[in-house]
């Protein structure tokens, strides 16, 4: 029994960690989940946002000065979009646990991102997108990808 307990603790980091996508792999996954031209934003915009938000890492978590945190490949914020159980006054507009956004399966992140971008601010909700992708040629982010 002790052996299995130790084995479980050793394997937990492997099970719990997310995934770091390759650029074209992420582009294909995002396209499969319907982000290509979603709300008028090309696939290049989504891949660019993911690069600068999380470096394509689904397990990324970053704390903000206001006490909220950003989660997952698109760094979805706990103040507005998900519930992390510790952000006071959180709205949880995606009606999802923030931990669900850390999965190697990006379905939850994409579904919540669709909700975020449907808001009046669109992709302006993502600071990294505003700073690195908005108004720029983002075709480089899908160049050479079979999407």
Swiss-Prot record:
Query: Keywords in UniProt for this one?
Result: Antimicrobial, Bacteriolytic enzyme, Disulfide bond, Glycosidase, Hydrolase, Secreted, Signal
Residue numbers binding substrate: 119
This protein's source sits in the domain of life called: Eukaryota
Record-annotated C-type lysozyme domain positions: 19-147
Endpoints of the signal sequence: 1-18
Give me the disulphide-bonded residues.
Answer: 24-145, 48-133, 82-98, 94-112
> Which molecular function terms from Gene Ontology are attached?
lysozyme activity
Q: Which CDD domains match?
A: LYZ_C (cd16897)
Tissues with expression: Expressed in liver and ovary. Not expressed in bone marrow, lung, spleen, intestine or oviduct.
What extra comment accompanies this record? Lysozyme C is capable of both hydrolysis and transglycosylation; it also shows a slight esterase activity. It acts rapidly on both peptide-substituted and unsubstituted peptidoglycan, and slowly on chitin oligosaccharides.
This one is known as: Lysozyme C
Instruction: Name the source organism.
Output: Dromaius novaehollandiae
């Amino acid at each position: 029994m002790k052996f299995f307990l130790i084995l479980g603790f050793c394997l937990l980091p492997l099970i719990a960690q997310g995934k770091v996508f390759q650029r074209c792999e992420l582009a294909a996954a995002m396209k499969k989940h319907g982000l290509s031209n979603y709300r008028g934003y090309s696939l290049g915009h989504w891949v660019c946002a993911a690069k600068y938000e999380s470096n394509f890492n689904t397990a990324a978590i970053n704390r903000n000065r206001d006490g909220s945190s950003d989660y997952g490949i698109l760094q979805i914020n706990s103040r507005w979009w998900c519930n992390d159980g510790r952000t006071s006054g959180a709205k949880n507009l995606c009606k999802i646990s923030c931990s669900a956004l850390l999965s190697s399966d990006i379905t939850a992140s994409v579904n919540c991102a669709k909700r975020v971008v449907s808001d009046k601010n669109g992709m302006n909700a993502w600071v990294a997108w505003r700073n690195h992708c908005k108004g720029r040629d983002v075709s480089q982010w899908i160049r050479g990808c079979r999407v």
